């Protein structure tokens, strides 16, 4: 690929396929004439339709997608795939209609057929877990690059084809977009791709039609209980990735009971990994040295196999993330010695992960990190890592998502108060919630945990970061947790431009530290 990355992640040279073949293959009902109708793509939103697309109308929270069939037809859609109710809504658009009981459940197989991704030659890695998914995906991508392999990725932060990046909107794309992306990667000669797989993606059929060569599991902790009523339900969604129709092999981090439970219930062969001393896991990772800039570690496997390297990231948890990436590569057929030689040549893993323990400061003043961590476990891991390598104070800035899991807020506040010397609570993405209500829950958790802790409530994130910076000096650390790579703040139905990274750099320059 030359020039800028495409705005649409689709193959440049799609092959038209007769829609009648799809109907016959899947035994679907038809309303209208399919004679001569050929499809080159599929779209789940009328705004994403391109000429030649099959428009897929599914029931939504507020409206049925089939109600927008006329707009899809105007954009160039050649047919509609929907359910019975949707067929009635789409009739006036004048397009042939293919009917199935559950169009979302059919979407992965349909998109795979349209884009011919069932015969994809690339090695596919799928990574799931509460924390660390994005990091492992980027570490896989980085190590593959150091091995000379043209790689791709899709993550919460961005989609990558080779060296070209496009901003993401979902952790895992809808099946229509994901299969189109894989087809484009095939055109670009991508030999391996790492895909971040959320629990919601598994529950909502976004990765249907894909068989991963290796699935990886990082951990499971409190999150998304607005989508899943209890932790066992959340776990069950993750477990779906470790089924024979999803993946050939798995690598599971067993540092928690959830990891052990996953090994017991997995229906594919799994290899285990642990950072716990004395563990009987197949692979064991041991931290050799931690600094604010890097973490050196040793990875020991079956038969005495050993690799020592480093990752340019803070914390033992990132050593575990890197180890998971390496073991996933080994399980897919890459040679451990070849991996070790490439990493030794380059002085360790050469990875940049946007918004994940990303250092923004220079050589003077406090050290400033921005991190996407937004769960109690992520807060705990990052603060513990900082405390081990920080001589001075830790000042933490954070908020919480509105209209998301409210049950974790008090615990987030408590962990921040226990782990930091000063805490600044601000607004993150309030969405339709009252921001003051969100801040109050975080403050209550912090006050109850450590009543004497220095707490500041500063609604505006720009002012909040500058407040944190005013509390820190040489030898101190400022951790801005939550915004990560994002360049907006979502409030009352609007996405307001705001990059915490850019603003932090500006504030550091204003203070004369950058």
Curated annotation (Swiss-Prot):
PTM comment: Carboxylation is probably crucial for Mg(2+) binding and, consequently, for the gamma-phosphate positioning of ATP.
Swiss-Prot/TrEMBL keywords: ATP-binding, Cell cycle, Cell division, Cell shape, Cell wall biogenesis/degradation, Cytoplasm, Ligase, Nucleotide-binding, Peptidoglycan synthesis
GO CC terms: cytoplasm
Gene Ontology MF terms: acid-amino acid ligase activity; ATP binding; magnesium ion binding
Enzyme Commission identifier(s): 6.3.2.-
Key word Manganese present: no
Chain positions recorded as ATP binding sites: 129-135
Tagged with keyword ATP-binding: yes
Domain of life: Bacteria
Enzyme class, UniProt record, top EC level: ligase
Pathway given in the UniProt record: Cell wall biogenesis; peptidoglycan biosynthesis
Modified sites of kind N6-carboxylysine: 238
Pfam families (UniProt xref): Mur_ligase, Mur_ligase_C, Mur_ligase_M
Binding, UDP-N-acetyl-alpha-D-muramoyl-L-alanyl-D-glutamate: 44, 46, 171-172, 198, 206
GO biological process, one term: cell wall organization
Main location: cytoplasm
InterPro entries: Mur-like_cat_sf, Mur_ligase_C, Mur_ligase_C_dom_sf, Mur_ligase_cen, Mur_ligase_N, MurE/MurF_N, UDP-N-AcMur-Glu-dNH2Pim_ligase
UniProt-annotated location(s): Cytoplasm
Family assignment from sequence similarity: Belongs to the MurCDEF family. MurE subfamily.
Function statement: Catalyzes the addition of an amino acid to the nucleotide precursor UDP-N-acetylmuramoyl-L-alanyl-D-glutamate (UMAG) in the biosynthesis of bacterial cell-wall peptidoglycan.
Name used for this protein in its record: UDP-N-acetylmuramyl-tripeptide synthetase
Species this protein is from: Leifsonia xyli subsp. xyli (strain CTCB07)
